[in-house]
Amino acid sequence: MKPGVSVVITSCNRIELLKRTIESFNTMNTYPIAEFIIIDDSGNREAHQRIIELYPDYTCIFNSSNIGLIDSIDRAYSMVKTKYVFHIEDDWEFIKSGFIEPSLKIIENNPMVMQVWVSNIHNQPLDIEPLIADGVHYRYASLDGMDHLWHGFTFHPTIRSMRVYRVAAPWSQWSTSEDFLALRECKIGQEYFMRGFRAAVLPDSYCIHTGDQDTTWNIGQK
């Protein structure tokens, strides 16, 4: 039996970007998904109702007020019932198929992988040493950037085990609302790094970023 995978999508009143993300994911994904969970942090009931209408078969969580990205993730992950979760923000477009299968091979063969990136569009530095898991080639995200503060943790599209998530859960405990997003990634990544975890990166990029400029997340969260 294949390992169970749920998809968690964080969104904040960007319906068109969300639609593009989900459509491209469903077009390019080749792995059975147990459940889709969308968490809407807009505080806008009309926007949330629109999401429900678009995706009646998905689990749609509504935050009545804006609680921020990290708290939204913790809330959504509390509802995940599967062993693994594929994490997506609402502003990505998948352009290549077959990304979950190789990611799972890495995680299942290396228990110290905190997440597997399915995109490296910013060409973040990677370790020189190539690794292989059940025929899948990958590398670790390098530790030589950002003055050794960042350890490869990202909110970009990734797959992780719920076991690893719980090691440092809830993520909201490691930063404050005043922290900008990159610093929050650094702080959470530091917790995993101190426990011996690393981020794995597939050799190909399976998706591209479509958002950034059209966001309603506040600066401390997005």
Residue ranges of predicted features:
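Conserved donor-nucleotide/metal-binding helix-loop-beta segment in metal-dependent transferases, i.e.
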Residues: 97-115
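Short beta-strand-to-loop element that shapes/binds the nucleotide-sugar donor at the catalytic cleft/hinge
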Residues: 116-130
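A conserved acidic beta->alpha catalytic loop
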Residues: 38-48
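N-proximal low-complexity "stem/linker" segments adjacent to membrane-targeting elements
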Residues: 1-23
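C-terminal catalytic/acceptor-binding lobe
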Residues: 20, 150-222
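Short aromatic/hydrophobic "clamp" motif used to bind/position activated sugar donors
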Residues: 85
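Short, acidic, metal-binding catalytic loop of nucleotide-sugar glycosyltransferases
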Residues: 23-33
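Glycine-rich, basic loop-to-helix element that forms the pyrophosphate-binding segment
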Residues: 63-79
